[in-house]
Amino acid sequence: MAMYTSIMLMTLASLALPIFATLVNPNKTHSYPNYVKTTMMYAFITSLIPTTLYIFSNQETTIWSWHWMMTQTLDLTLSFKLDYFSMMFIPIALFITWSIMEFSLWYMSSDPNINQFFKYLLIFLITMLILITANNLFQLFIGWEGVGIMSFLLISWWHARTDANTAAIQAVLYNRIGDIGLILAMVWFLLHYNSWDFQQMLALNPHPSPLPLMGLLLAAVGKSAQFGLHPWLPSAMEGPTPVSALLHSSTMVVAGVFLLIRFHPLMENDTLTQNLTLCLGAITTLFMAMCALTQNDIKKIVAFSTSSQLGLMMITIGINQPYLAFLHICTHAFFKAMLFICSGSIIHNLNNEQDIRKMGGLFKTMPLTSTSLIIGNLALTGIPFLTGFYSKDLIIEATSTSYTNAWALSITLIATSLTSAYSTRTILLTLTGQPRFPTLTNINENNPALLNPIKRLTTASMITGFLITNNIPPTSLPQPTMPLHLKLLALYMTALGFIITLDLTLMTNKLKVKTPPQTFKFSNMLGYFPTIAHRMIPHQNLLMSQNLALLLLDSMWLEKSMPKMISQTHITASTTVTAQKSMIKLYFLSFLIPLALALLLMV
């Protein structure tokens, strides 16, 4: 045990060496990106040793290394929890980051600040590993906020673009809403448990009130872009493609789901939280699959598929299967990173063209990228014996045999069919048919920095599902039994999506352009959610503020107090003055007549 903990700590510490190197020698060197990439490769190879030892020993451990601060009721320590989740996730995160960094050497080669870009990617990974290995809420919160800050810096990397800056601010604002829930949960645990250590919280009261669990759920909804707080995820595609690949595969977006997995022992007996998680995940997976079906931006299609798969993970947590949700996190990371790298390869070769309607015929000009894109999409749909099959098929089986909610099952099956539909649409429009891009486009996929990551991730997308499922520690749950037609239900829905999409694509190839129906607009406009939240509500607030300012400032203050008040004062004075007609003789005469009459009466 001491051996594999020491090796794992050494692996994590080695990741900080490139950052310290920039502090010692801040001068820009051309070899720094290669140095970071090589460090990542060695860290991955080293991390395989403790992971292998853990799989054979199945003994988790906690490392208490440093007491940071003590108060009367709270002891804050730096401690690492090396259990099944962290030991399995660390090599996966390192492998994917290594591949993405090698891809970045090709994709970002012309960027003048490539050294800083690699440094940001490395810090992004380190903060995620801090979150994964945290043994207390304080350390988890540091990693939680770290991935949020780094996502802001990386999404807005091309800060000369207005859309990139807007997308980065949008990501931060939506994550702030989720952070409120995490902070409320931390305050509640501190007040009621006087501790932020996971072991003590579970030992003191495994059945807390729903309030902190609602806070944790809100945090997960914000970070993992569930329905309601989802618009930031497709907007984050404004960042460079390596950022999108790292953000969506093994770092920020899975942090919310991982938070619920880590706190699942507190949630498993709370039916309200479980049902909310289940229903929210079901709505998210269906809505995002619907949105992906009508998008034309290749990166946004992959982004919506990520959000749909995150909804599937939430469904799994909602039916009390945290290990299955974690398995889907691990398998999903490989083919999602590969899909983004293949998309980046196509975009880069087509001179930054992202519209799939302007592609086509790429299978002959980019054979390796095309093959990997097909394998990645097939793994995403859950085709048997690819990586995605081992987790996605199990999730649908677990949902089918769950007594919780038949409505969630039906929505999950529809979303599964839609997943195969938009994956097939992407393959057909991007790779097949006649080329629809300019003929002078120079396509070249011979760079080793592009080919090696794609080959590695393609291989991983085919075999890692089998390897991981064979190394899950045994649980006490009985093996579910089900009829054959229920066992093949997921495959039926996937095949249905393939067939419908193929038929629709062949049928619509030669149709005239018509006005799209309202259902198409609803899906294409993302359910009008961004229009209402980002346009209509701010417009109404601005209009109301303008009217209020007009009434208070212009109409009342400026007019009533200054110009109109002066004129009104002068009008009143002039009216008083002009009421006297200057008929002094008539006035004296009218005074003398009654006086004369009085004198006559007295005589």
UniProtKB/Swiss-Prot annotation:
Documented EC number(s): 7.1.1.2
Q: Where in the cell is it found?
A: Mitochondrion inner membrane
What the entry lists under InterPro entries is as follows: NADH_DH_su5_C (IPR010934), NADHpl_OxRdtase_5_subgr (IPR018393), ND/Mrp_TM (IPR001750), NU5C-like (IPR003945), Proton_antipo_N (IPR001516)
Ranges that cross the membrane: 4-24, 36-56, 87-107, 122-142, 171-191, 211-233, 241-261, 272-292, 301-320, 325-347, 370-390, 406-422, 488-508, 583-603
Q: What reaction does this enzyme carry out catalytically? A: a ubiquinone + NADH + 5 H(+)(in) = a ubiquinol + NAD(+) + 4 H(+)(out)
Membrane topology reported for the UniProt record: Multi-pass membrane protein
Biological processes, Gene Ontology terms: electron transport coupled proton transport; mitochondrial electron transport, NADH to ubiquinone; mitochondrial respiratory chain complex I assembly
Which top-level group of life is the source organism from?
Eukaryota
> What cellular component GO annotations does this protein have?
mitochondrial inner membrane
Q: Name any one GO molecular function.
A: NADH dehydrogenase (ubiquinone) activity
Q: Pfam families, from UniProt?
A: NADH5_C, Proton_antipo_M, Proton_antipo_N
Top-level enzyme category: translocase
Q: Which UniProt keywords apply?
A: Electron transport, Membrane, Mitochondrion, Mitochondrion inner membrane, NAD, Respiratory chain, Translocase, Transmembrane, Transmembrane helix, Transport, Ubiquinone
* UniProt record similarity statement: Belongs to the complex I subunit 5 family.
What PANTHER family does the record tag this protein with?
A: NADH-UBIQUINONE OXIDOREDUCTASE CHAIN 5 (PTHR42829:SF2)
Q: What does this protein do?
A: Core subunit of the mitochondrial membrane respiratory chain NADH dehydrogenase (Complex I) which catalyzes electron transfer from NADH through the respiratory chain, using ubiquinone as an electron acceptor. Essential for the catalytic activity and assembly of complex I.
Subunit structure, briefly? Answer: Core subunit of respiratory chain NADH dehydrogenase (Complex I) which is composed of 45 different subunits.
Protein known as: NADH-ubiquinone oxidoreductase chain 5
State the organism named in the record.
Answer: Papio hamadryas
Record gene name = MT-ND5
